[in-house]
């Protein structure tokens, strides 16, 4: 299999079931996006012209046929995002490409120029507060020293393997409430070396991979993959007094 950054992230996530991992990354099972994910995909489509895979998502209209506040808020934020990109001198070169090398695969949001210089950009829409800390919430965008930046490493490494050039990686993050952050990820050679070692470790670990059930009622009851090894009842907590 060709390695994606999400495959590595989920493989080493203790709360991600091994059976689900096999279904998603080996067998091609596609999970349905949550409402929050749908909002993010619609925001991408409105802002840069496409979401991943070119799929279109829509928010149901009200009974009157008019757009809901949820839809109007996304439209308003996307217009702000487009103006922000213009103000930052960001120009789109390629939107939602699929990149492949001999061993890696990736789907960056956009190849761009920033003030005339080629770069990679990931566009984010989030409902978290501006000052919410990455230390406690992996989806937050404050206290960035705690953020997992393997996504940036993966795409920068891929582009280097494809084109022989290291590009700057940017996150352009828009909060549902209207805040915005433009983050440049300055990747050191040691960070890239560490990521290449992680790729080698992943390849080695994959050889001994066994799709074992996670045995967690909390996780299994929400899982869309109805395997015959799922935990159907709450786990027993034993206590001796």
State what each model feature region is.
Residues 103-105, 118, 179-182:
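Short, mixed charged/polar active-site loops
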Residues 3, 67, 71-76, 82, ...:
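Metal-dependent nuclease catalytic regions and adjoining charged, substrate-binding loops involved
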Residues 57, 131-133, 168-172:
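Short acidic alpha-helical/loop segments enriched in Asp/Glu that coordinate divalent cations
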Residues 108-138, 155:
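Conserved catalytic cores of phosphodiester-cleaving nucleases, focusing on short active-site segments
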Residues 32, 63-67, 132-146, 185-187:
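Short histidine-centered catalytic/ligand-binding loop motif
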